[in-house]
Structure formats: C-alpha cells, structure tokens
A protein has these predicted regions:
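Acidic, Ser/Thr/Pro
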Residues: 31-221
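N-terminal amphipathic/hydrophobic targeting modules at extreme N-termini
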Residues: 2-4, 14-16, 20, 24-28
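Short intrinsically disordered, low-complexity coil segments enriched in acidic
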Residues: 1-7, 74
Length: 221
C-alpha cells in the first residue's frame, strides 16, 4: 500500500533520507498521497498525519541527523515539547516505546520501532542562520530552522511560535562522566536504519535533513 521512489545517491556531506507514511488504520487514502519520499540534502519536508498513522524515517546512508518537530493539526500553538517529554518519560532522551508529549502535556508521537542503536538527542537546539554566522560562515547557509518553516509553509500553514527545540533523530550527544558536560559525536547509525513514530493525535510533522557541515555531527563529515 505504499508507492516508493528510488532514493537519491550522493557523496555530499549532507546525505538524503527517506520518510514513509504507512497507514495503519482503515482510512480512505490514495497511493499518491501515501508514498515514500526523499528529503533532499540540506532541505526539509512536512507531512500531515491522522491519529494512528505511522511515520517511518529511514537513514538510507546511515550518516544523517534528522531534526524533527510536531504540532497539533488543529492548533499549532500546541507543539512537541522536549522538556515536557523528559518530565513524562523521566529520561534524558527518548527510547523505543516512549511517548512524546506536547507543551500541553498531551501525547503526540510514540516511538514504535527503532532499528538504529537508539541514540537520539533532545537537548541541542536546531541549527539556524545565526548559529552558522557565529561559526564563521559568511552569507546564507541552509539550516534546519528555515527548513522547518519552509516545509510547514508548503502545506499551507504558518508556525505561530517557532522554536529552536527539535528532536534530533540519530544525533549522538554524549553525557560525560561528570554528569554535566556534553560531547558532540558522529552518528552511529548504519545504512538502512530506521525509526517509526505513531501519531497519537492528528498532527503535522516537519523533518529536516540537517545541513550542519561545520561541527562534526554527521558520521562522514
């Protein structure tokens, strides 16, 4: 029940990822609307999910970090809250089986499958243009924050209170032995690893194929 396209191949630092929407409940749909797509390197995509639908994110090259946001489909003032999720799960970062909640404490996404090493990050802010300028980049550099805004706009929505706080899927941020310091490390996923989320409410999900090529977060930078 899924139509797929051939994944793009690239030797660039920022590889592409695939996302796939799989209808789990008996809902009317067309194959054209529910298919595997490729997120181009350094760009983003957004998708609307109904409660009970699944979103499968496949790391086809095994080296890509994916920044992810989610909003209540009928109220974009309600959004995925990582700080509230940490309170809910009592974990530093989400794991298989965990439910992610919104700023209104409502369940929005649950991790139902994860073939990766299970390393994801909920602490680091997404990259944005000021971040790259502070890293010494002149002019414009594609970034996850703009990718998020663009992808949601493509669906005809405007995010009322955009946040830098994204769930950084596959990102490897280690807590050091002192219990305080963090270390940014390359991702540990392998080609074909995937994570699947189940929507707990009608929602909009945005994903960015992270363009970060200054700080070593992608495993082939």
């Amino acid at each position: 029940m899924v139509w797929s396209t051939d994944a793009a191949t690239s030797n660039d630092v920022n590889q592409t990822i695939n996302w796939q929407c799989i209808i789990l409940s008996a809902l009317p749909f067309s194959l054209k609307e529910n298919r595997m797509k490729t997120i181009e390197a350094c760009h983003g995509k957004a998708i609307e999910l109904k409660a009970g639908n699944s979103l499968k994110v496949i790391n086809i090259h095994g080296s890509q970090v994916v920044d992810l946001w989610a909003w209540n489909g009928s109220n974009l003032n309600e959004y995925l809250s990582l700080e509230a999720t940490r309170v809910w799960s009592q974990r530093l970062n989400p794991q298989l089986g965990d439910t992610l909640v919104t700023n209104m404490r409502n369940p929005i996404l649950t991790i139902v499958q994860d073939t990766s090493p299970g390393i994801h990050d909920s602490f680091m802010a997404c990259c944005d243009l000021p971040r790259y300028h502070r890293l010494g980049v002149n002019g414009y550099h594609r970034n996850c924050f703009d990718n998020m805004l663009e992808s949601v706009s493509e669906l005809g929505y405007k995010v009322p209170n955009p946040t830098l706080a994204s769930l950084n899927v596959f990102m490897n941020i280690a807590v050091l032995e002192d219990g305080i310091s963090l270390a940014t490390r390359p991702v540990e996923t392998k080609a074909g690893d995937y994570i699947t989320f189940r929507a707990e409410m009608d929602c909009i999900v945005s994903m960015s194929s992270c363009p970060q090529d200054i700080v070593k977060i992608q495993s082939d930078v």
